[in-house]
Amino acid sequence: MKRRYWLLASVAIMLSGPALAAALPPGEVDLFRAVEQDRANSVKKSLAAGVNPNARDLGGETALIVAIRNDANDAATVLMDQKGIDLEAKAPNGNTALMMAAYRKNQPLVIDLLRRGAKVNQSGWTALHYAAAGGSAEITNLLLDHKAQIDAESPSGMTPLMMAAREGQEDAVKVLLARGANATLKDGGFHLTAAGFALKADKPWIAKAIDAHLAAKGIKPQ
């Protein structure tokens, strides 16, 4: 029985590649393969052959978002250089290229996207949420330098400070507090402050740092 299971699983794996390839035009299949493998010259060839730089894979992600998700910086640069590239195209989950770069803590691409004019703010989840949750103080500062809304709220009312606190990202918490994040806000689901999320996630040292910040400003911790 076990041997039969593994045989069926192996067949499924072998068939998945051709099945996926058949669902996209050949040119787009070549583009996404090149993007995932960071083969910049092959990406250029696909685009020169007329493949849409904003093409989407079977999961609905654009080639640029796929490149960033795979840390394929060379491929991403080729795509961003294309006339008509949509830097603001969203994946089905709402992610943009900048959000993915922040999530991957890919500072060079974050810098490049910002230089090219990628939007920092939007309703709901933002790149700053992802940078804070990932703990990158550098990217958090970069986004704030480009006017990121420091207390941006996710659909459930989560702020970047809450995300950083919940994930135990002390450096990001320090940056956000130093730059004016409101530590008294509560989310709309659990009705917790950033310190409350830190405690809920068993990160008491983060909660202590936030409470000390509030106390220094004469605000009673909640």
Task: Please describe what each predicted stretch is.
Residues 24-33, 56-62, 90-96, 121-127, ...:
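Ankyrin-repeat boundary/"N-cap" motif
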